[in-house]
From Swiss-Prot:
Stated name of the protein: Thymidylate kinase
Binding site for ATP: G10, I11, D12, G13, S14, G15, K16, T17
Enzyme class: transferase
GO cellular component terms listed in the entry, alphabetical order: cytosol
Gene Ontology MF terms in the entry: ATP binding; dTMP kinase activity
Taxonomy of the source species: Bacteria, Bacillati, Bacillota, Bacilli, Lactobacillales
Organism whose genome encodes this protein: Ligilactobacillus salivarius (strain UCC118)
Amino acid sequence: MEGKFITFEGIDGSGKTSVLKGVIEHLNDKRIDNYIWTREPGGNRISEAIRKIILNVEYTEMDARTEALLYAAARRQHLVDTVLPALNEGKLVLCDRFVDSSVVYQGVARDIGVEPVIKLNEFATENLKPDLTLYYDVEPEISLKRISNNRQNQVDRLDKESMDFYHKVRQAYLSLAESNKERIKVIDASQNLDKVIDDTLSILNNFM
């Protein structure tokens, strides 16, 4: 039996990670344990080491293509060590970010181009695509305020990007969702957390 691969996407501060925690609580309450929860970049020893490089605030001079290559490298190892074994065991894989993040952040916001980023990640993932993607949409003004309020002592390199950068990321996500309506479901993340979790569970219940 093959598992299901569900990814959670959104700009930084969209609340997707908090929603994921709510989904995990729901699964645990229902005594559902045939799942894993993971993240990108990260999810295993090598990919977590790459994550530290990518997000290090000291590396503000990092070239956009270097960044894209590091994400792809972390993604490949994450798939091999974590995602694919779980899917082959028939598990539900809940992943905080996947290829869509690279498309919008590096492909669009960093101006590398969508096609080069897609091709790079096709190589890294061997064309593996999520069965379902949940995109948490929120205005950057709201998301960055959340970051400021909640992560004052944990600022990473991406938190230092401009408002214009995050507006580009958001618009890229919306365009991606528009062209992939079957796979990507848009959730209003400006609502309170409980409502966003309820909307998420409703979509997941219909999907499963």
